[in-house]
Each structure stands twice: as C-alpha cells, then as structure tokens.
C-alpha cells in the first residue's frame, strides 16, 4: 500500500516538480531571511514558513499561467503545455492543501487563521485582475495598487505574519510590506514591457498578448483619454511583434515608462526610509538595491 501511495504522490506532484526545476529568483525566501534580521524566529520554524511560502507561491504560478494563457515561464514551456490543464489545476490545488498541512505543524492557534486570511486576499486580488482584463475595464491607478496589495501582499503578508507569531518583535511591518509589494509588482510590470532580460526570458511583452492592464498601460490609458490605441491593442490579445513594438514605442512617447521608473524610485526611497525607521536592515536594503538596478541601468 505504501508504494502505491508514493506513486500517487509522485504522479500528483509531477507538474509542480516540473516548475520547481526551472531557474527562479527565490525572492520570497530571501525576503523572509532578511526580515528575520528583526524577527529572530527559531530556525526550525523559519524553515517551515519559508517552505510553505514557496509552495503557495509556486502553486499559484501554475494556476496563473493557465489563467493568463501563458506560453513560457522563466523561458521554458509552461507546465500545462506539457501536462495538460486538468492535471496542473489539480496539482496546484493539492499543493495549497499540503501547505495548509505544513502550517498545522507550526502548532500555533493563529497560524491557520492567518493562512486562510492571506489566501483569501490572494484570490480576491487575482480575481479582480482577471475581471478587469476579461471585461476590458481599465482600473484607475489607485484601484490597481489596491489589487496589487491583495495579490502580492497576500504571500508577503503570510510569510512575515507567520514569522511574527514566533517572534518577540511586535512592531507593525504592514506599511513596509505594502511598499515592497507595490515595488515588486510594478517592477515586474515594467520589466515585462521594457527590459531586455525579460523579453529573452518571457515571450516578448507577454502582458500585451495576455491583455493585462499593468502599471505602464494604465498610465497611458488615463493620461491620454482621447486615444483608445492601448485598449484596442490589449483587447486583441495580439502575438504580432510589430503591433507590440508599436505599443512599447507609444508607451515611451506618452511618458508611461518614465512615470513608472519615477514611481519605482519613489517606492525604493520610501522602503529605505521605512527600513531606517525600524533600526535598519542591511540584508533587506541589499535586496531592494539589487532589484532596483534593473530600472536604473537601462537609462544611464
């Protein structure tokens, strides 16, 4: 019977394991380790929390790629193009519950409550993002930021929230987490449409093909209400390179990339200020600095 159980587990987890072997940046793990500079969580608890966060993050990527109709993930074929959509959905959902099972081993009365709250946030944010895209409704910048805080903040909040359950450090880290959540997502949006590294790794400007309203496109749409070019391009779900190149050129012309870079610089400065106010954190500063290179080097 044992053997069969092992085989079943292997079959169920194969799409998930496929994703794990793709090269990733491990930003969430680095983030948890950096926050531990303040929180000083016992190593055994920290390892479980890092594992849970990585599991949920990677499982959500499997689902994301289906919802976004993506072709590539980190430069490799998406899991569902190899294993099929049904198996991948099941595998990702299975991993969510394995994550929950792991949270139970932390043996803290508030851990499951926190897990549930943050996963609800994650799905609310993701649901809004999909709703706007599929109903061709462009959110305002404020609406978009609120959604991002649910989506990226969901998993950031989970890792740090679980860590705080096992820490004597009780200062409110939410404002800093919010700044970092916005910084990460807007940086991703910028990279998808503007960075060399990204276009080699993801199919060129994939956010345009997906029809996604991202930070630069939202700026372009609201700053030029008389033009419907961007909406029309997003609506087409185009794979045409020339149309996508034209859209990037248009975003450059109307100042959307510059606006996005300035927003990122403001968020970066705000993060340093919030880190300083909590007594400093060299690891976290180094991580933010490293991630900021991308939108600075390009324009020097």
UniProtKB/Swiss-Prot annotation:
Where is it chiefly localized?
A: cytoplasm
Q: How does it assemble?
A: Homohexamer; trimer of homodimers.
According to the record, how does the cofactor bind? Answer: Binds 3 Mg(2+) ions.
Q: Where is isopentenyl diphosphate annotated to bind?
A: 25, 28, 57, 74
Please give the activity regulation comment for this entry.
Subject to product inhibition by geranylgeranyl diphosphate.
Subcellular location, record wording: Cytoplasm; Cytoplasm, Perinuclear region; Cytoplasm, Myofibril, Sarcomere, Z line
- Look up the coiled coil feature and give its residue ranges: none
Q: Which residues are noted in the entry as dimethylallyl diphosphate-binding?
A: 73, 151-152, 185, 202, 212
Annotated organism of origin: Homo sapiens (Human)
Cofactor(s) required, per the database record: Mg(2+)
Statement: the UniProt record of this protein carries the keyword Oxidoreductase: no
Gene Ontology CC terms, in alphabetical order? cytoplasm; cytosol; nucleoplasm; perinuclear region of cytoplasm; Z disc
Pathway given in the UniProt record: Isoprenoid biosynthesis; farnesyl diphosphate biosynthesis; farnesyl diphosphate from geranyl diphosphate and isopentenyl diphosphate: step 1/1; Isoprenoid biosynthesis; geranyl diphosphate biosynthesis; geranyl diphosphate from dimethylallyl diphosphate and isopentenyl diphosphate: step 1/1; Isoprenoid biosynthesis; geranylgeranyl diphosphate biosynthesis; geranylgeranyl diphosphate from farnesyl diphosphate and isopentenyl diphosphate: step 1/1
Q: Which gene encodes it?
A: GGPS1
Which InterPro entries did the record assign? Isoprenoid_synthase_dom_sf, Polyprenyl_synt, Polyprenyl_synt_CS
Mutating residue 259 to C has which effect?
In MDHLO; shows slightly decreased farnesyltranstransferase activity
Name of protein: Geranylgeranyl pyrophosphate synthase
Name the reaction it catalyses.
isopentenyl diphosphate + dimethylallyl diphosphate = (2E)-geranyl diphosphate + diphosphate; isopentenyl diphosphate + (2E)-geranyl diphosphate = (2E,6E)-farnesyl diphosphate + diphosphate; isopentenyl diphosphate + (2E,6E)-farnesyl diphosphate = (2E,6E,10E)-geranylgeranyl diphosphate + diphosphate
Checking PROSITE patterns in the record gives: POLYPRENYL_SYNTHASE_1, POLYPRENYL_SYNTHASE_2
């Amino acid at each position: 019977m044992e053997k069969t159980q092992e085989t079943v587990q292997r079959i169920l987890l194969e799409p998930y394991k496929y994703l794990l072997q793709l090269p990733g940046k491990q930003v969430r793990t680095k983030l948890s380790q950096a926050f531990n500079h303040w929180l000083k969580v016992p190593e055994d608890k920290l390892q479980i929390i890092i594992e849970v966060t990585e599991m949920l993050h990677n499982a959500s990527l499997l689902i994301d790629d289906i919802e976004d109709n993506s072709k590539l993930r980190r430069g490799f074929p998406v899991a569902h193009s190899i294993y099929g959509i049904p198996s991948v959905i099941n595998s990702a959902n299975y991993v969510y519950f394995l994550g929950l099972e792991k949270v139970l081993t932390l043996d803290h009365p508030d851990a499951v409550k926190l897990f549930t709250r943050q996963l609800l946030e994650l799905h609310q944010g993701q649901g809004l993002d999909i709703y706007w895209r599929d109903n061709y409704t462009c959110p305002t910048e404020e609406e978009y930021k609120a959604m991002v805080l649910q989506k990226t903040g969901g998993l950031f909040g989970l890792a740090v929230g679980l860590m705080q359950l096992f820490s004597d450090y009780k200062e409110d880290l939410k404002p800093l987490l919010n700044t970092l959540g916005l910084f990460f997502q807007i940086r991703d949006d910028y990279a998808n449409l503007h960075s060399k590294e990204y276009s080699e790794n993801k199919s060129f400007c994939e956010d345009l093909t997906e029809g996604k309203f991202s930070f630069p496109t939202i700026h372009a749409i609201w700053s030029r209400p008389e033009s419907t070019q961007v909406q029309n391009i997003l609506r087409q779900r185009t794979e045409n390179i020339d149309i996508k190149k034209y859209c990037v050129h248009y975003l450059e012309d109307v100042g959307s990339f510059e606006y996005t870079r300035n927003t990122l610089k403001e968020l970066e400065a705000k993060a340093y200020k919030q880190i300083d106010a909590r007594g400093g954190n060299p690891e976290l500063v180094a991580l933010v600095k490293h991630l900021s290179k991308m939108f600075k080097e390009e324009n020097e």
